[in-house]
């Protein structure tokens, strides 16, 4: 049940990427593997990221051509994630695929809380949660969904229908089962809103459960690269 892998796209944000990787590897329910996709970074430190992290559960997939060059439409983070998604399907992994942007960070119990919430309920093939908004200086400014200080009465929420009108899924908290990934195919390089496009399509195939407890720090106000 708790078998999952993590996909982290990155470009030229080495220190932030290290933080994201470590937050995934140190989960109380650890992932089977963390896949980092380097989108042709100019930073030479990415060459040694496996050695610096020192975990056999880390795999770095390196793109020779950046998504910007490939698509001609800015940084297409979905295109970068697809590298890992295809790899996961190719090796026959059966379980959950979790997404984490390189400037975001998980709380240590993030995966455990989500798995406890869904239990054996086969209705939900996508899991997500609330998150704390945090600026690049580390200042927390509130909840991403709702208002900080307001009591959340529901511990979980079915957000499947909401996904048709707005995006209730914070991508860096999302897990999707590999069975749904296979049916969805690639994330589409549609520019702004490609995350929402992915979850909209997923909502037609499966239920989406959101844990209302914040389980990640979501970076706002960072102008570089992959903040969507």
Question: Which sequence ranges carry the predicted segments?
Answer:
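N-proximal low-complexity "stem/linker" segments adjacent to membrane-targeting elements
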Residues: 1-23
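Short beta-strand-to-loop acidic/aromatic patch adjacent to the donor-nucleotide binding site
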Residues: 93-103
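Conserved donor NDP-sugar-binding/catalytic core segment of glycosyltransferases
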Residues: 109-143
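Short beta-strand/loop segment that forms part of the nucleotide-sugar
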Residues: 32-40, 61-64, 101
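Glycine-rich, basic loop-to-helix element that forms the pyrophosphate-binding segment
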Residues: 66-91
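Conserved nucleotide-sugar donor-binding catalytic segment
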Residues: 78, 150-228
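Short, acidic, metal-binding catalytic loop of nucleotide-sugar glycosyltransferases
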Residues: 22-31
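A conserved acidic beta->alpha catalytic loop
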Residues: 38-49, 65-67
């Amino acid at each position: 049940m708790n078998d999952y892998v993590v996909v982290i796209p990155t470009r030229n944000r080495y220190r932030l990427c290290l933080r994201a990787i470590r937050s995934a590897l140190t989960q109380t329910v650890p992932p089977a593997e963390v896949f980092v996709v380097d989108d042709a970074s100019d930073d030479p430190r990415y060459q040694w990221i496996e050695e610096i992290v020192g975990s056999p559960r880390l795999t770095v997939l390196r793109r020779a051509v950046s998504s910007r060059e490939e698509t001609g439409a800015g940084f297409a983070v979905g295109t970068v994630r697809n590298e890992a998604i295809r790899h996961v399907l190719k090796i026959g992994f059966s379980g959950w695929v979790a997404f984490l942007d390189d400037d975001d960070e998980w709380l240590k119990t993030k995966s455990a809380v989500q798995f406890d919430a869904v239990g054996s309920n086969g209705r939900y093939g996508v899991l997500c949660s609330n998150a704390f908004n945090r600026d690049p200086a580390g200042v927390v400014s509130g909840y991403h969904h709702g208002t900080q200080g307001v009591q959340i009465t529901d511990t979980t929420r079915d957000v499947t229908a909401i996904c048709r009108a707005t995006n209730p899924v914070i991508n860096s908290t999302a897990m999707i089962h590999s069975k749904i990934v296979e049916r969805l195919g690639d994330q589409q390089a549609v520019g702004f809103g490609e995350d929402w496009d992915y979850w909209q399509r997923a909502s037609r195939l499966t239920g989406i459960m959101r844990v209302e407890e914040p389980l990640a720090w979501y970076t706002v106000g960072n102008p570089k690269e992959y903040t969507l």
